[in-house]
Amino acid sequence: FVGELQVRDVIYKTVMVRLPVLVPGGLCAPPKRIECPCLAVFRADAKHLKRCKGKGCVIYLHGNGTDIGGASEEAKTLARELDCHVLVPEYPGYGLAEGESNEDTVDAVTHACIRFAVELLRVPHDRLVLYGRSVGTGPAAAAAARMTLSSPLGPPAALVLHSPYTSIYEYAKEKAGGLLSYLLVSERWPTRKNLTQTGCPVLLIHGDRDEVIPFRHSAKLRKDAAKRSTSANTRKDNVKSKVNKAGDGKFRHDTRGASAGVVQLHVQKGASHNVFDFYGDVADPIASFLKRHECAPWHKGGEPWEAMDLDLRHLDARVAEFGPGDMEEYPFANMS
């Protein structure tokens, strides 16, 4: 699933990157460095291969029943339909990735991928779209909330949740019953709460015949959207104050105005959890949503961003030198 595809004057180059990540080392142990594969689809100028000219970047957090290989065709479709770059990080324990998959390690990989996009690839935070599918909707919503509340970056351009759950605990309660879920399942990825703390437009996509994660989960999330209007105004004031306090205005700015509080639900008519039209019921609704709700730069007449001048031939070496970053930046380091 790696290689190149040329469409007129654009080349979509798919490569595999070894993403350095810090994960918890266990009880009283220091964090451990691992490497997780990350599928990267870069949109390049056919005449100037070193120049990447996408409108932005999508970080795609895939579902439970697949890996980055299984998500590769969807990633390429998003790159073509949205005129953007796409990163698909692998979860520890999935595919060829080492380690164990749990909330802390998946959140750590998500953090490392966002850091890779923003700091190494130089993607502005307001050109970064977080897209989660099924189980990936939890870490995607959690990352958007962290970027809004505590990250020096600011909120992403948009958050897209495809077949989301309100929380892992509520999902387990439906499947196993209240007592059993209380005894065996802790509260993880509380998307319902995280959406009230997210300062960007949110698109929910759900099949009305989803037999794995029932449609009512998205309906509940959409119903709670009214709570975001007040929260969005508070976050907007907080972001402005942080810009003034920092004094440099770098990254921290709110470009979405009232759209920051938008939560829109797209219903996939007749679609189940795994059977749906990816073009018509995922890629196209995302493209329309980004244009409608002032998500830079999709609403600016399709102008490409400034070229990154990134030589992809040396990407592996640059990533290795870049490293996993400081432990204090990771979500697990800030758990109370």
Range-by-range predicted roles:
Residues 1-30, 320, 327-336:
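An N-terminal hydrophobic leader/cap segment in hydrolases
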Residues 132-142, 212:
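Glycine-rich nucleophile elbow surrounding the catalytic serine of serine-hydrolase chemistry
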Residues 209-213, 273-275:
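Acidic catalytic loop of the alpha/beta-hydrolase fold
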Residues 220, 230-336:
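C-terminal catalytic histidine-bearing segment of alpha/beta-hydrolase fold enzymes
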Residues 197-199, 203-206, 210:
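Short beta-strand/loop motif that positions the catalytic acidic residue
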Residues 122-134:
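Alpha/beta-hydrolase fold nucleophile elbow
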Residues 20, 28-116:
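Membrane-embedded segments
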Residues 91, 156, 160-170, 187-191, ...:
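Active-site nucleophile loop of the alpha/beta-hydrolase fold
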